[in-house]
Swiss-Prot record:
One of the primary rRNA binding proteins, it binds directly to 16S rRNA where it nucleates assembly of the body of the 30S subunit. Belongs to the universal ribosomal protein uS4 family. GO terms for cellular component: small ribosomal subunit. Part of the 30S ribosomal subunit. Contacts protein S5. The interaction surface between S4 and S5 is involved in control of translational fidelity. Keywords: Ribonucleoprotein, Ribosomal protein, RNA-binding, rRNA-binding. The lineage of its organism: Bacteria, Bacillati, Bacillota, Clostridia, Eubacteriales. One of its GO terms (molecular function) is rRNA binding. This is Small ribosomal subunit protein uS4. InterPro entries: Ribosomal_uS4, Ribosomal_uS4_bac-type, Ribosomal_uS4_N, S4_RNA-bd, S4_RNA-bd_sf. It comes from Desulfitobacterium hafniense (strain Y51).
Amino acid sequence: MARYTGPVCRLCRREGMKLFLKGDRCYTGKCAIDRRAYAPGQHGQSRGKKPTEYGIQLREKQKVRRIYGVQEKQFRSYYDKANRQKGIVGENLLRLLERRLDNVVFQLGFATSRPEARQLVRHGHFTINGRRVDIPSFLVRVGDVVGVKEASKSSPRLKEILSSLDRTPPKWMNLDANAATGTIIALPDREDIQLPIQEHLIVEKYSR
């Protein structure tokens, strides 16, 4: 399946919540869902039919996929991996998604959105333990140090971001704003993931 390249604000309206896909714009009055808090399309404002159990499960899966920018095949791969791990499957799934390099870059404040973080990673602006990594899906481990590549610190976009770096990252990572690095000090716990996600619905969908 090809990556969605249309208006991302439609995705937020489809899911009925802010997915924070456009960075700073999402925090302003220009956000589309603040102005049109209904689904896109001709019948977006109509009530429609009551969603089925399967429909609710599908929407939850689509919402999480869109938050993290993961395609269906890869998302299923994450689920299968989570299912093989010890512990609660849904929490395992979210933990894998949180460990993606593009998400870590976003959480550290080196990008204003996950899509921007994904693009910056692909362009080779980040290192892990001093080595350049340009794979957004790379899974970080405890002890990894994620940093902005030295040569990239002078690029206009990253220079702008680093000059106003004020994000407080989750407790499973430490940020050194002066060095433009972040250290993974633990794996994320469920309470660290402050997103309105009902992961049990995703597990139920794939268990059908």
